[in-house]
């Protein structure tokens, strides 16, 4: 399994007062940015159906999200983020099992692995940082991203990054606490931008993922 940080996240539907609530909680606005994300998969959706998500972000490079911790229920996800191109390529060859792997960057192996663009869209993001009161100074802050995609969809995400599986429950507890402070209903589940994009523009692919998820074959919705 590829190594990387474990991302623990929960998506929610932001309201008109979300930024005001963040300010009241003492969150600080880190930056506002605009970027393009492009996602790749095979025509059979081999990656997404196995809960792997390959993305190229403009200005940031490649990332492969792989399934993380299992067995923790609720409206949240845990993924291992792999950003080293060598590690991504190794994982892609392991997943897709196509021929002999040679040293190369991700872009160079797209063709041989039959990976093609399945989605591309622009996001405007405001990124906030928040440390819960009483937290130790060395504890990582939570990140709250508020995204607006160019196809008319907005979604928020509360995120924590941890190094070990043992840290996931504590991170999840913080995420649930902050979500509650922001007025997010306990069981609210907001879909990722990619899933909404596929639903609108590639409905057949979206339906395949939906059917696989309902049958327990996949656990989609990681794409941020």
Swiss-Prot record:
Gene Ontology terms for molecular function: magnesium ion binding; thiamine triphosphate phosphatase activity
Family matches, as Gene3D superfamilies: Hypothetical Protein Pfu-838710-001
Co-factor note (free text): Binds 1 Mg(2+) ion per subunit.
Matching Pfam families: CYTH
Family note: Belongs to the ThTPase family.
Domain CYTH: 5-201
Protein name per its UniProtKB record: Thiamine-triphosphatase
Species, as recorded: Mus musculus
Binding residue positions for substrate: 11, 55, 57, 65, 125, 157, 193
Residues annotated to bind Mg(2+): 7, 9, 145, 157, 159
